Curated annotation (Swiss-Prot):
Lineage of the species this protein comes from: Bacteria, Pseudomonadati, Pseudomonadota, Gammaproteobacteria, Enterobacterales
Transmembrane parts of this sequence: 10-30, 52-72, 96-116
Species per Swiss-Prot/TrEMBL record: Escherichia coli (strain K12)
Keyword annotations of the record: Membrane, Transmembrane, Transmembrane helix
Any Gene Ontology biological process: response to antibiotic
Chief localization: membrane
Membrane topology type: Multi-pass membrane protein
A GO CC annotation given for this chain: membrane
Signal peptide: none
Protein name: Uncharacterized protein YkfM
Gene: ykfM
Length: 159
């Protein structure tokens, strides 16, 4: 293989490992993981969409894929030799990527009704929505909505 072909391969993998996958993972984190964490934390105001579960497991899958691409980039740049340990590490990262991708596609939609049930029993939609709608803001039961903001602090300050 010519040197310029190896250089092109290395630069494309380096671009994916350093720029593309971290940017993609950041978007998955802020759209999938962070809102689900607010549900786990029992926040007073949450944003819920059942597809966030798919994004959460997709975040884990693409994190392992990013590690896999970084390992391959290091191997391509000849910084480490290809040994049994390195081969094992690359095999494990691609297997974990596929496992979490399978969970995101198959199991996450099956878990979604249970999370939706939890949201419906402990929260109510803030707005004119009746029922569960994708991308709705919910607040804890017993609290009032005021233009999408929680007005409990204002009510306690008036009394």
């Amino acid at each position: 293989m010519r040197l310029h072909v190896k250089l092109k391969e290395f630069l494309s993998m380096f671009f994916m490992a350093i720029l593309f996958f971290p940017a993609f993972n950041a978007s998955l984190f802020f759209t999938g993981v962070k809102p689900l964490y607010s549900i786990i934390k029992c926040s007073t105001e949450i944003f819920y969409d059942w597809r966030m579960l798919i994004l959460c497991f997709g975040f884990m899958s693409f994190s392992f894929l990013n590690i896999h691409v970084i390992l391959l980039t290091i191997i391509k740049s000849f910084l480490i030799k290809k040994t049994k340990v390195v081969n094992f590490a690359t095999d494990i990262t691609i297997q974990l990527t596929l496992i979490f991708l399978l969970i995101a596609i198959v199991i996450a939609p099956l878990i979604a009704p249970f999370v939706t049930g939890y949201v419906n029993t402990n929260y109510h939609p803030c707005g004119n929505n009746t029922g569960i709608f994708p991308g709705a803001i919910y607040i804890k039961n017993g609290m009032k909505c005021n233009n999408g903001y929680i007005s409990r602090k204002e009510d306690s300050a008036v009394k």
